[in-house]
Amino acid sequence: MHDLKAVSTLFDLRGDFVHGYSYGSGHINDTYCIWVDQAGQRIRYILQRVNHNVFKQPIPLMENVKRVTDHALKRLKEEQCPEAYRRTLTLVPSVDGKPYALDSDGNCWRVYPFIERARTYDQIETTKQCQEAARAFGEFQKLTADLPGEPLFETIPNFHNTTSRLAALKEAIQSDPLGRVKEVQKEI
């Protein structure tokens, strides 16, 4: 595990690291929950190491995240949303004011305030959960539809290019490098 205390000092957390632990069930980034003592009050944060194998250029990714989250928060405040800070992620700046920090090994880290009483799901189990996910996605689209400035940086080339993704799938099925096609024939 990474030295979470050392990494936490890279961010403007305005307190002292107490402890941290691996958090959640995600499989892309390394996610940790950390506790910070702020004048006698313990506050939780999410600390994430961006996966450099997936995101080859993490700094433009973080610039995208900052633009989108700042804009969504601005829109929620304009709508006088009483829970604006619960409805969008908010990046905690690094000690040098950036939306990320690089550790001595070159790993890119980010910190968000922990959103208490929030829930995440790895799998949808009910129709209501599916409806809520669709509603949340629609709300996000509405909040970011008027995002000003240049287009966002393409963090994973062709990720949203359906033609390219289908071609890659067909190639993987054809070559079947791990011999798994026969096990998933029904899905194909």
Each predicted region: which residue ranges?
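A short linear-motif detector with a strong N-terminal bias
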Residues: 1-2, 10-13, 24-28, 88-93
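Juxta-kinase regulatory segment immediately upstream of eukaryotic protein kinase catalytic domains
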Residues: 1-21, 68, 72
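A generic alpha-helix structural signal
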Residues: 8, 69, 134, 185-188
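ATP-binding glycine-rich phosphate-binding loop
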Residues: 13-38
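ATP-dependent phospho-/nucleotidyl transfer catalytic cores
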Residues: 14, 21-25, 46-49, 55-59, ...
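Short alpha-helix boundary/capping motifs
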Residues: 35, 75, 168-169
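ATP-binding pocket architecture of kinase catalytic cores
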Residues: 41-66, 71-149
